[in-house]
Amino acid sequence: MKNNRILALSGNDIFSGGGLAADLATYTLNGLHGFVAMTCLTALTENGFEVFPTDETIFQQQLDSLKSVDFGGIKIGLLPTVGVAEKALNFIKERTGVPVVLDPVLVCKETHDVAVSELCQELIRFFPYVTVITPNLPEAELLAGQKIETLDDMKDAAQKLHDLGAPAVIIKGGNRLSQDKAVDVFYDGENFTIFENPVIQGQNAGAGCTFASSIASQLVKGEELLPAIESSKAFVYRAIAQADQYGVRQYEANQN
């Protein structure tokens, strides 16, 4: 490993189960030097769990501060607005050859308002510039523009997202297709790989962030994509098994 510096473009989860806390914990456990450009803050208010986007000028200043840093990999998480996303996209366009993992987090993903639609279109613009995308089932439905109710639907959506420009796709199905097992579908443009694990009951906040940052970490360390996904699946499974009320536990997962 020639370069152990890895960047997260992600938000701050106030409870530290996900977001930049999960990213940095995962980077540290992999022996990497983690950097963060913060995309948003979060807080639990009388209105529920709220997201407060980073001012676009400040976000750009963060990225400008990192221009001279040579990164071995980048993980992209919550991009709360089109404006923030555009600045992130311009940043990775200048990093050709660097592995990039895009976790296309869609806030309020159960709604289909104009803001979500615009953000979907902006995230699709990232696809040709990343290594792999890691949507969950609702995010894959929004990005692919289709309902997913069966394993074949997951495969169709993965192919559609690949056709939109993503070199590789892993759709995290969770337990929506089956009550007793979690099903994920990986597609690299040629072959499908199906992952199945028993469902763990409990808090899984931060699992998606941890999964994406673990994949990015393995790629920085020189692993090929499919083995990176396989080892990251195992790591996240252990992290969910050790979760508390605030989310998955990366450090405890690494001890098992």
Predicted regions and their residues:
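Acidic-glycine-rich active-site phosphate/pyrophosphate-binding loop
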Residues: 1-2, 8, 19, 179-194
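Conserved N-terminal subdomain of the carbohydrate kinase-like
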Residues: 2-8, 20-109
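Short pre-catalytic strand/loop immediately N-terminal to key active-site residues, enriched for Gly-Thr
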Residues: 10-15, 192-205
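Short glycine/serine/threonine-rich phosphate/pyrophosphate-binding segments
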Residues: 15-24, 209-212
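Phosphate-handling active-site elements
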Residues: 31-35, 192-193, 218-231
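Charged C-terminal helix
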Residues: 53, 226-256
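Conserved phosphate/ATP/ADP-binding segment of small-molecule kinases
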Residues: 116-191
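Short, small-residue alpha-helix embedded
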Residues: 141-142, 201-225
